[in-house]
Amino acid sequence: MTRTVPGPTDRVVVVGAGLAGLSAALHLLGAGRRVTVVEREELPGGRAGRMDLAGYRIDTGPTVLTMPDLADEAFAAVGTSLYERVELIPLHPAYRACFADGSSLDVHSGAEAMAAEVERFAGAAEAAGYRRLRDWLQRLYRAQMRRFIDADFDSPLGLLHPDLARLAALGGFGRLDARIGRFLSDERLRRVFTFQALYAGVPPARALAAYAVIAYMDTVAGVYFPRGGMHALPRAMAEAAAAAGADLRYGQPVTRLERSGGRVTAVVTDAGRIPCDAVVLTPDLPVAYRLLGRRPHRPLGLRHSPSAVVLHAGTDRTWPHLAHHTISFGAAWHTTFDELTRAGSLMSDPSLLVTRPTATDPGLAPPGRHLHYILAPCPNTDIGPGPAAWSDLGPRYRDTLLRELERRGLDGIEAAIEEECLVTPADWHARGHAAGTPFSAAHTFAQTGPFRPRNLVRGTENAVLAGCGTTPGVGVPTVLLSGKLAAARVTGVPGRRGSRPRSSPAAAGSARQSGDPALTGSGAAPRARGESAHRLAPAHQPPASSPDFPAAARQSPPPGSPPAGPTAPATEGRTG
């Protein structure tokens, strides 16, 4: 039995209307609590916000949605459904991977489509290895989900469960890169199933194999896009919460918490005082701890994940060979991780995520125009350039990235940009994110599960944390779970799983939208590294089938200014 908030918990204030806060609010409402949600911005979403710029509707946060049933659980808590409120479009391919040798691969979640694509790309032996890998990923997910991901921890003793032995038997405590190498010998394919470790802030060669569960979410469970953009998800969650009786108060920053002994008795905003029996705090950890007036002691300080530079570009043209999500891998893969996590330097041969949301939803841009989001991982401000350095470095790095994209086949991209938004670690820092990163604490072994900052804070009886900095961690699915787990700490009632029939996401094309009205080359041997064939080229089309990082954006103001538009408390990555 895990610990819960003692005493009365009828009135709950949730601080932050991001994905974590809205998930917590819906689960609390479903358990009969009276819920007030306070949000500093003028609309819901947190990092999964929206910026309107000259007719471009820009998602300021996560671009990848996986495992939508976890979001549906929150809707189900108040008797409604995600699939009734948001049209989810399955992405085929989920990603397109482009490599420095000129080859490309479409990544599909369907087993047969992906096996056929792997065989085209790397031969029958690798396709057989992919099938074995897929089976292993499914078993790994089943061993982890209920006990180690969708679970609260009060101590490391919570790990002692038969599923721990199952996880060990599956090789979950080995190294990720080595374990994937048991199934796939092609280095390019191994990258497709290990790059997700960057979400966890650990290079694949050092990450636990258990983190392959993130690859399961991306490559097996499927990737979706809400019509109207990712912001359609938190908007629908906020509407469902309001319909269930929540009091949502926007544009009200929290200034302090009132306490009596070990309990928080009220949340104070610049608009007034809100009495409470319990509070759920979803801001980034430094902000939450500052409000609480206490910081838990850790033998070692938290180690943070890499950050990201994101350029959001509204253009007068596109490059049709770009998929919705295209990963452009540099040749210097292992060097990249050393630069990001050890040397603290910008990538010398960058691996980039290019997202083209208008490939799926043209209504996100003016007629005849297109949106492209370019995400470049970079060091956080603890080990890399500090916030002040980015005032000059940001614009120069933006130019470097555009030149590199031109070299990789996006001819004329700089000239095509009509409107743009840029975010750097300085902006994350200005919004209160530790180490200037939206990806929070890295998922090292010492910062995972019961070793991650817990959602109950010692010395405070009735405050619970949610968001990417606490359990389970970074990413849209896990941030949604963090809200559910926080609600369970208040109510003592675990969120219900599978409590009612759900519509299939694949059938979501007929679902009604609520709220916002708008709401892979041949299998030839690779060329030598450094050869000039690295282009974002179209992939060979595979048979018909049946990459979160979180991003943020601002219209480029004077360097060092805080970002415009909605932002945090959490990803996706993959945060919320």
Where are these regions (language model features)?
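N-terminal glycine-rich phosphate/pyrophosphate-binding loop and immediately adjacent elements
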Residues: 6-143
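Short beta-strand to alpha-helix junction loop
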Residues: 165-176, 218-239, 389-397
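Mid-domain catalytic core of redox enzymes
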Residues: 255-366, 507
